[in-house]
């Protein structure tokens, strides 16, 4: 798909993981089961986002006007993956192999939203067909199995087990696993790196390319040099070749962090200005990628700051570069008029260009659109109070 999964009405789409554990005919545990009313256990892992209003209440009935901040975002980006960790304790008397089955399930509307619909349709005199007023609502909307898999684990001292070979290539499974951990942020970067090293051992460019991303994300001592080396190994692949636009973007990020601003500017211009045959065929247009545009604008801004000298030639060159950076950030605002980074940099640029009035406009916009971390924290505290399960499941 060309968008996040799930997309659209994410306040009510219900996508969740159902996990069951068995040993022989004995059920040992489960997550993601439904109650008698058809609602899913709130301690389950949901593939959605959990939006809050200013009071920490969930946005759950199409009240988009009240959206304030996400508590978590579990949507899966295009071509990406997601990892979820489960822990369990086996009874001491288990002797048969452990069977674990996982299903990703989809239902168009969750029970919270359908209860709201049921209430409103009853008030309008048009109750939902089949529901007797005064009886508890049961969510009987159809459930689709998006994907499922199972694995069998041996028990110490028990019989050996053999799992059927997977149709999905091993490198792809390692790569997806690594991407899922990479997207979790700092907490699981080391595990992501190990997964990407396995991908590289299996002969795919994705391994060193994504390893470079993880190293840049962590950016400890010497890791930028290691990231640059990994990126060179990825670029050396030819069958298949690493996407040149991704290589250029990561090269720019690394060069920028290492102070090689001229090289970084060249890299970012490659991403936003070049159009290869493959990009045209696949309808890729990175000239509208405002993340890269902002990186380009910041790099030009930094290079302008490096121009020294008080003679007219130096002043003219510096002003020209500052104006060039302005134009790049204005391109970002044509795409995203509320882009905080663009407004912040434009405020700084116009200040240096002596345009105080324009600087003030963008300073005000930056203050208006930037995230209020204090208010966000209060909303999250309220949400955790009302939904204790979220303290664990929002970061699972």
Locations of the language-model features?
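Structural marker of alpha-solenoid helical repeat scaffolds
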Residues: 201-202, 237-240, 274, 285, ...
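Short, conserved sequence motifs used for protein processing/export or organelle targeting and
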Residues: 1-180
């Amino acid at each position: 798909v060309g968008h996040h999964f799930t997309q659209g009405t994410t306040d009510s789409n219900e996508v969740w993981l159902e996990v069951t554990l068995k040993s022989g005919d004995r059920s040992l545990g489960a997550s993601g089961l439904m109650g008698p009313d058809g609602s899913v256990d709130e301690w389950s892992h949901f593939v959605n986002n959990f939006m809050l209003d200013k009071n920490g209440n969930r946005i759950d009935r199409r009240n988009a006007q009240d959206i304030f901040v996400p508590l978590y975002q579990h949507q899966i980006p295009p071509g990406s993956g997601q990892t979820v960790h489960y822990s369990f304790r086996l009874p001491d008397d288990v002797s048969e192999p452990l069977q674990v089955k996982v299903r990703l399930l989809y239902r168009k509307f969750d029970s919270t939203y359908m209860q709201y619909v049921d209430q409103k349709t009853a008030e309008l005199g048009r109750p939902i067909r089949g529901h007797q007023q005064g009886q508890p609502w049961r969510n009987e909307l159809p459930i689709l199995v998006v994907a499922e898999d199972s694995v069998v684990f041996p028990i110490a001292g028990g019989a050996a087990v053999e799992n059927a070979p997977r149709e999905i290539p091993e490198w792809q499974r390692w790569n997806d696993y690594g991407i899922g951990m990479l997207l979790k942020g700092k907490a699981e970067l080391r595990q992501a790196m190990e997964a990407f090293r396995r991908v590289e051992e299996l002969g795919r460019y994705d391994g060193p390319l994504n390893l470079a991303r993880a190293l840049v994300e962590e950016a400890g001592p010497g890791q930028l040099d290691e990231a640059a080396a990994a990126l060179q190994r990825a670029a050396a692949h030819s069958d298949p070749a690493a996407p040149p636009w991704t290589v250029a973007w990561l090269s720019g990020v690394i060069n920028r962090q290492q102070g090689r601003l001229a090289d970084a500017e060249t890299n970012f211009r490659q991403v936003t200005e070049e159009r290869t045959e493959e990009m045209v065929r696949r309808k890729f247009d990175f000239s509208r990628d405002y993340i890269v545009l902002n990186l380009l604008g910041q790099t030009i801004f930094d290079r302008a700051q490096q121009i020294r000298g008080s003679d007219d030639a130096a002043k003219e060159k510096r002003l020209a570069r500052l104006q060039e950076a302005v134009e790049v950030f204005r391109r970002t605002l044509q795409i995203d008029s509320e882009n905080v980074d663009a407004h912040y940099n434009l405020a700084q640029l116009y200040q240096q260009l002596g345009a105080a009035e324009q600087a003030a406009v963008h300073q005000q916009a930056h203050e208006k659109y930037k995230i209020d971390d204090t208010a966000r924290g209060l909303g999250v505290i309220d949400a955790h109070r009302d939904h204790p399960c979220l303290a664990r499941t929002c970061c699972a």
